[in-house]
UniProtKB/Swiss-Prot annotation:
Enzyme class: lyase
Protein name: Fructose-bisphosphate aldolase, plasmid
Needed co-factor(s): Zn(2+)
Gene behind this protein: cbbAP
Binding residue positions for Zn(2+) 2: D105, E142
Active-site residues from the entry: D83 (proton donor)
Pathway the protein contributes to: Carbohydrate biosynthesis; Calvin cycle; Carbohydrate degradation; glycolysis; D-glyceraldehyde 3-phosphate and glycerone phosphate from D-glucose: step 4/4
Gene3D superfamilies xref list: Aldolase class I (3.20.20.70)
Cofactor: binding comment: Binds 2 Zn(2+) ions per subunit. One is catalytic and the other provides a structural contribution.
Classification of source organism: Bacteria, Pseudomonadati, Pseudomonadota, Betaproteobacteria, Burkholderiales
List of residues binding Zn(2+) 1: H84, H198, H232
EC number, as in UniProt: 4.1.2.13
PANTHER family (UniProt xref): D-TAGATOSE-1,6-BISPHOSPHATE ALDOLASE (PTHR30304), D-TAGATOSE-1,6-BISPHOSPHATE ALDOLASE SUBUNIT GATY-RELATED (PTHR30304:SF0)
GO molecular function, a single term: zinc ion binding
């Protein structure tokens, strides 16, 4: 199946009331794991590449691995999404490279560490929407800074994360401002700030309403019911994988992620895209540590990497099933990018 746009996939998810996990990918094993789980569950896929992933693997390598995935799994719709673009120029390069969706993160300045002002965010996001929509490519924007309501820290992943201590107002998207932002930019999807953060260390305890503002999602959705909402920093940090890592020599302190049941509350009130990275990293790291420890004479890295792929696949499958994605892939008929470009006009 040809690659599809984020807008088409999230429109389908909105119509049928499910959420789509968006998995960050860096290598072959991760893409294999995601596609195998998608095939098993008949789920559509969002494969997204951060700046760190593009630097690590090379954009051309990532693009061709995703094209290979589309060729190998012709019945699975795939969105190729650029995560956290730092400027219109970065987004333009990704569009030219074949990405079907880009994120312009104007909540931060181009250094991806300095919080921006509202007018800057509107300006750069609007410019990307005009450019992307002209060729049928979808755009995700961000309003508010990702950060922990518990600590005031943004967390950092692949070089993205506001520096310093943030105020609660900065870390919570304002619903009325969200309405204005969407009207002025034309984004297809909006990443919102509700107290989640990048990385494994999100919360020091199982999150409750004082540090995870799930109820804010409903307030935002009521203001922009036709714009798809996105949760970033939404790995659940499975405790079983933390225990395996520790059991086989890892040193990870106590930490908690976003519970799946809280994500499901978000999906019921307008969240359609859920970004997940850390969960796959934990599963792969735990599986590799276990594999190497159980056979110390093994020197073929493929054995450990196969174990890593199996671990990642188990996490991905659980998310597809939990979010209501399973069984949806075969219902989606691709819309050509040229046709979408006409629709945007």
């Amino acid at each position: 199946m040809a690659l599809i746009s984020l807008r088409q996939l999230l429109d389908h998810a909105g119509e049928f009331g499910y959420g789509v996990p968006a998995f960050n990918v860096n290598n072959l094993e991760q893409i294999h794991a995601i596609m195998e789980a998608a095939e098993e569950t008949d789920s559509p896929v969002i494969l997204q590449a951060s700046a760190g992933a593009r630097k690590y693997a090379g954009e051309a390598y990532l693009r061709h691995m995703v094209l290979a995935a589309a060729e190998t799994h012709p019945d699975i719709p795939i969105v190729l999404h650029q995560d956290h673009g730092s400027s219109p120029a970065v987004c333009q390069a990704s569009i030219r490279s074949g990405f079907t969706s880009v994120m312009m993160d104007g909540s931060l300045r181009e250094d991806m560490k300095t919080p921006s002002d509202y007018d800057y965010n509107v300006d750069v996001t609007r410019r990307v929407c005009e450019m992307a929509h002209a060729v049928g490519v979808s755009v995700e924007g961000e309003l508010g800074c990702l950060g922990s309501l518990e600590t005031g820290q943004a967390g950092e992943e692949d070089g993205v994360g506001a520096a310093g201590t943030l105020s609660h107002d900065m870390m919570l998207t304002d619903p009325a401002q969200a309405r204005d932002f969407v009207a002025r930019t034309g984004v297809d999807a909006l990443a919102i700030a509700i107290g989640t953060s990048h990385g494994a260390y999100k919360f020091s305890r199982k999150p409750t309403g004082d540090i995870l503002a799930i109820d804010r999602i409903r307030e935002i959705h009521e203001q922009i019911p036709d714009t798809h909402l996105v949760m970033h920093g939404s790995s659940s940090v499975p405790q079983e994988w933390l225990e395996i890592i520790r059991q086989y020599g890892g040193d990870i302190k106590e930490t908690y992620g976003v519970p799946v049941e809280e994500i499901l509350r978000g999906i019921k009130t307008g969240v359609r895209k859920v970004n997940i990275d850390t969960d796959i990293r934990l599963a792969m790291t735990g599986a590799i540590r276990k594999s190497l420890a159980e056979d110390r004479s093994e020197f073929d890295p493929r054995k450990a990497l196969l174990a890593a792929k199996k671990g990642a696949r188990s996490v991905v499958k659980l998310r597809f099933e939990a979010f209501g994605c399973a069984g949806q892939a075969s219902k989606i008929k691709p819309i050509a990018m040229e046709q979408l470009a006409q629709w945007y006009r």
